[in-house]
């Protein structure tokens, strides 16, 4: 008897772009373990698996103010465009600043007007008849550049970035930090440096690269060099300082920051509908 359902196959196809038969076979080989099935499809060459697997289903918006960034979810984009929903997000991000809230539990308990953030969300949810959720929050207390991006002109911002930085020259610092925020919004860096990437994630990427190269029939003696090349490519995808700059792809983000005398100390990126 199969240890997976038709819904599992459908979800795996949506996340990975793989065909029905490949998805079924991956679930069989993984003994019903969904995450393992995704990994097997990566090894076998399904396109964009890693990027698609990050997706979630949600609508809503991101809002930023004075070092704070929040994501507030709704069930539909109709509500995301609602003026009261957007006003609530503004109230919540202001509360995040006042409370210096770096997590949703702290922020839910924070005051907004004569109530709490949690109650304000519940009140609007009851009024409009749709589930609303405060999904995540971040707060940086240093010098911060924020950037918000809209997916469509008639929708509120769906991508938000905070970049905390240090700079000797305020104007150069702000200019460089803004460029970095745009970079993060577009290329979705997850880590600041290579050292920030967890060892188990690097080891897993190395293993997948080796298995993929073997499946492609690469000669055994060439595997170490191929694997290192693919791991380097992985770093360029996920590590901010290793990425080619969108403003000058002949230079890395690190090189451009060094030229400007700017140090990025941390960053965060929220995107509605993604993990």
From Swiss-Prot:
GO terms for cellular component: cytoplasm. SUPFAM superfamilies: Elongation factor Ts (EF-Ts), dimerisation domain, UBA-like. InterPro entries: EF-Ts_dimer_sf, Transl_elong_EFTs/EF1B, Transl_elong_EFTs/EF1B_dimer, Transl_elong_Ts_CS, UBA-like_sf. Signal peptide: none annotated. GO terms for molecular function: translation elongation factor activity. CDD domains: UBA_EF-Ts. It holds the Pfam family EF_TS. It is found in: Cytoplasm. Gene3D superfamilies: 1.10.286.20, DNA helicase RuvA subunit, C-terminal domain, Elongation factor Ts, dimerisation domain. Its main location: cytoplasm. Residues 76-79 are annotated as: Involved in Mg(2+) ion dislocation from EF-Tu. Keywords: Cytoplasm, Elongation factor, Isopeptide bond, Protein biosynthesis, Ubl conjugation. It comes from the Bacteria. HAMAP family: EF_Ts (MF_00050). Associates with the EF-Tu.GDP complex and induces the exchange of GDP to GTP. It remains bound to the aminoacyl-tRNA.EF-Tu.GTP complex up to the GTP hydrolysis stage on the ribosome. This is Elongation factor Ts.
């Amino acid at each position: 008897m199969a240890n997976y359902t038709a819904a599992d196959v459908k979800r795996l196809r949506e996340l990975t772009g793989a065909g029905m038969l490949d998805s079924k076979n991956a679930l069989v080989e993984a003994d019903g373990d969904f995450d393992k099935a995704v990994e097997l499809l990566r090894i076998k060459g399904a396109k964009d698996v890693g990027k698609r697997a990050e997706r979630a289903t949600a609508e809503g918006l991101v809002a930023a103010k004075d070092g704070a960034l929040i994501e507030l979810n709704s069930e539909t984009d109709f509500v995301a465009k609602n003026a009261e929903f957007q006003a609530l997000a503004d109230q919540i991000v202001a509360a995040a600043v006042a409370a210096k809230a770096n997590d949703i539990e702290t922020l839910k308990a924070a005051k907004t007007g004569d109530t709490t953030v949690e109650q304000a969300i519940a009140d609007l949810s009851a009024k409009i008849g749709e589930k609303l959720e405060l999904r995540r929050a971040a707060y940086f207390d240093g010098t911060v550049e924020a950037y918000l991006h809209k997916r469509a002109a008639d929708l509120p911002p769906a991508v938000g970035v905070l970049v905390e930085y240090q700079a000797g020259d305020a104007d150069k610092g702000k200019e460089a930090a803004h460029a970095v925020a745009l970079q993060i919004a577009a290329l979705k860096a997850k880590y600041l440096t290579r050292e920030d990437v967890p060892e188990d994630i690097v080891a897993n990427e190395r293993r997948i690269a080796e298995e993929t190269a073997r499946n492609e029939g690469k000669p055994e003696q060439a595997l170490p060099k191929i694997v290192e090349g693919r791991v380097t490519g992985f770093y360029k995808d996920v590590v901010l300082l290793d990425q080619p700059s969108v403003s000058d792809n002949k230079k890395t983000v690190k090189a451009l920051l060094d030229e400007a005398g700017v140090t990025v100390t941390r960053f965060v990126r929220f995107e509605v509908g993604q993990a």
